[in-house]
């Protein structure tokens, strides 16, 4: 647990010393610690009436305040993220659009300030996207019908531990939670907490700083080929071991049935804001949340397995193009996008450029099969007639491309030069097939750069 201590209200504060301490703490955490978010589920069967009313009111007041910020920003000259977070009352409207003034009873001023920051970040994101050209026009932020998260900024002030329970500000009773054992990490330091409302219940997401873990690599290189029929095909160079991993999370019958009911109501122009519509929407969200949790679990297990390798090589596949070309359902039911997004951030990952022909080359004789179609599952070399599985062959080629690129000087590693390098090697092999391939590669790489000393001591092919 954290040993954070705070001065009492009676003692004078040395702001310069506090600022210096914050800078030192931030530098120490950046160099020695990782940020992790642990999710604890509130035990809904142990809630009394006061706690239930608090959980209902805090999200309701958060919605009122968020919408009041948007309304404040629609007045000319005002910005939505500069709304007064210290005001003790908020104006909202009933179904007949009559104004009602209510007092904040559950949502603290610090939480309201966090909502202001969230709105400011959203405005900044919209502005930058307009400037870059990702979006052409926008109406700005709009009013919302619900808010599903509330931030508690400061540990031991806005939120704290009460034994094995969690106490939130403005709530007299602490909450019993599942998953408290996750926090038993040596040297852990707590930052902020976030109360989240999901279809499956209420959760508290605790942001922590934990000491960095040193992963023991197995000094092996693995190539990963993404696909639709087979989600992932892996090849380990040192052991010549290949695997085919398929992940498909189908919609349950309950989810399909609920989706049909909602679609039928929409076709008959019934509102989904009625009691029945809201009940069906909640059921659908709960079933989708369950499927999303299954995908997340499979993704975490696969990423944990990949972290043990010294080098992970994969190609930056264009999944959005796959989705638009008739493979949308397979992409939606799989975990390709999730795995790609996480693995790209790992320190032991090397990402190949998306336009490299990883399936068409055969690196033993360095010939290219130009007639290979997307639907063909076998690779046949036009020169030596070797027949191999297409996906395993692509995973092997990714490691070969990685080794080839690592031999090239850093200033010559742009995609255009790499493609010219491949064409040059292929031509030289055709002219003199008896010459060793490694010697040809070294000659071509030395010709890329005038600094021949940069190619001294090249790794062997």
Regions found by a protein language model. Give the residues of each.
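Gly/serine-rich nucleotide phosphate-binding loop at the start of the catalytic core
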Residues: 2-114, 460
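Positively charged, helix-rich recognition surfaces that bind polyanionic ligands
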Residues: 3-9, 200, 204-461
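Generic detection of short hydrophobic beta-strand segments and adjacent strand-loop junctions
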Residues: 36-45, 171-183, 243-250
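Acidic carboxylate diad motif detector
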Residues: 87-198, 333
């Amino acid at each position: 647990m954290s040993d954070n201590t705070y001065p009492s209200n009676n003692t004078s504060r040395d702001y310069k010393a506090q600022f210096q301490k914050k800078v030192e703490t931030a530098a120490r955490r950046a160099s020695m610690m990782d940020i992790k978010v642990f999710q604890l589920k509130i035990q809904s069967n142990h809630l009394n009436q006061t706690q239930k009313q608090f959980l209902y009111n805090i999200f309701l007041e958060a919605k009122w305040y968020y919408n009041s910020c948007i309304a404040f920003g629609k007045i000319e000259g005002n910005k939505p993220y500069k709304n007064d977070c210290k005001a003790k009352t908020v104006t909202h409207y009933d179904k007949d659009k009559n104004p009602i003034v209510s007092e904040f009873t559950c949502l603290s001023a610090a939480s309201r300030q966090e909502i202001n920051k969230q709105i400011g970040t959203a405005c900044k994101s919209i502005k930058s996207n307009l400037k870059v050209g990702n979006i052409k026009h926008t109406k700005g932020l709009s009013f919302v019908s619900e808010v599903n998260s509330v931030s508690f900024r400061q540990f031991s002030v806005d939120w704290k531990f009460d034994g094995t329970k969690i106490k939130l500000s403005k709530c007299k009773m602490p909450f019993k939670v599942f998953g408290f054992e996750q926090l038993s990490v040596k040297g852990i330091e707590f930052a902020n907490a976030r109360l989240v409302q999901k279809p499956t219940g209420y959760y508290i997401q605790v942001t922590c700083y934990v000491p960095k873990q040193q992963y023991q690599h197995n000094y092996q290189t693995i190539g990963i080929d993404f696909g639709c029929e087979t989600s992932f095909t892996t090849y380990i160079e040192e052991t010549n071991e290949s695997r085919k991993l398929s992940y498909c999370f189908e919609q349950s019958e309950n989810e399909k049935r609920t989706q049909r009911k909602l679609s039928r109501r929409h076709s008959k122009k019934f509102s989904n804001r009625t009691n029945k519509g809201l009940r069906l929407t909640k059921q659908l969200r709960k079933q989708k949340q369950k499927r999303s949790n299954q995908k997340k679990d499979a993704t975490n297990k696969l990423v944990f397995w990949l972290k043990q390798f010294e080098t992970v090589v994969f190609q930056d596949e264009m999944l959005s193009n796959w989705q638009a070309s008739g493979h949308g359902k397979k992409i939606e039911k799989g975990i390709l996008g999730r795995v790609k997004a996480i693995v790209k951030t790992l320190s032991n990952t090397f990402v190949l450029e998306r336009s490299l022909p990883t399936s068409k080359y055969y690196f033993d004789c360095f010939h290219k099969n130009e007639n290979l179609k997307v639907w063909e599952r076998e690779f046949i070399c036009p020169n030596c007639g070797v027949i191999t599985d297409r996906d395993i062959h692509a995973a092997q080629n990714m490691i070969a491309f990685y080794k080839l690129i690592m031999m090239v000087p850093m200033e010559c590693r742009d995609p255009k030069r790499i493609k010219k390098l491949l064409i040059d090697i292929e031509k030289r092999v055709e002219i003199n097939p008896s010459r060793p391939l490694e010697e040809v590669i070294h000659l071509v790489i030395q010709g890329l750069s005038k600094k021949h000393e940069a190619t001294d001591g090249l790794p062997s092919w």
